[in-house]
Design a protein with these regions (language model features):
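Active-site-proximal alpha-helix that buttresses catalytic centers in soluble enzyme cores
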Residues: 1-174
Length: 174
């Protein structure tokens, strides 16, 4: 009940000029070189936002810890970033865990974890592949690596979707 009261109050409080927005970033997580690259990428954002990382594919304990760490710093408004290619990737799962939805996701595998307990107002987004800026980022990275463009071929690889429906949607978007 106390969490609900705080969350309701936070929803109506305007963001003051000295108040910081918290950000939880949920990348896939992998090997140390991958994780280090992610950390370097988001480092410039740390001067403007309080940031917590929640590596993994929607682990409720990791998400709870990240949200709690921000709340313990006085953060009342949080942006939850699903750092995945498409906007719908893990959205149902994380929305359920974050308490933004009561619908148990269709693609759920294993035991259903509890929804997190928090008083912050949370908004979510994801889907970097759907943003036109990604093409410019790819081009910039290719130019950094390229030595002899006239002799080189660029191949982009991805492991694909978790099911045929997701893969067909991905191909349609391309």
């Amino acid at each position: 009940f106390l969490y609900w009261m705080k969350k309701t109050a936070n929803r109506y409080l305007p963001l003051s000029s000295d108040e910081t927005i918290g950000v939880v970033i949920m990348p896939h997580g992998a090997t140390k070189p991958y994780n280090d690259a992610v950390e370097r990428t988001i480092e410039p954002l740390r001067s403007k936002y309080k940031i917590e990382m929640a590596y993994g594919m929607g682990d409720a304990v990791t998400i709870q810890n990240a949200i709690s760490n921000l709340e313990n710093q006085g953060i009342k408004k949080i942006v939850f970033v699903r750092m995945y290619p498409t906007s719908d990737q893990l959205k149902e799962k994380t929305d359920y865990i974050l308490g933004l939805s009561d619908k148990i996701p269709e693609q759920w595998d294993g035991l259903i974890p509890p929804q997190i307990r928090n008083s912050a107002v949370i908004n979510t987004f994801g889907g970097y592949e759907e943003d036109n800026l990604i093409a410019g980022i790819f081009l910039e990275r290719i130019k950094e690596l390229s030595k002899k463009p006239e002799e080189e071929t660029i191949i982009l690889l991805a492991h694909g979707g978790s099911n045929d429906k997701a893969e067909n949607l991905r191909k349609k978007r391309m």
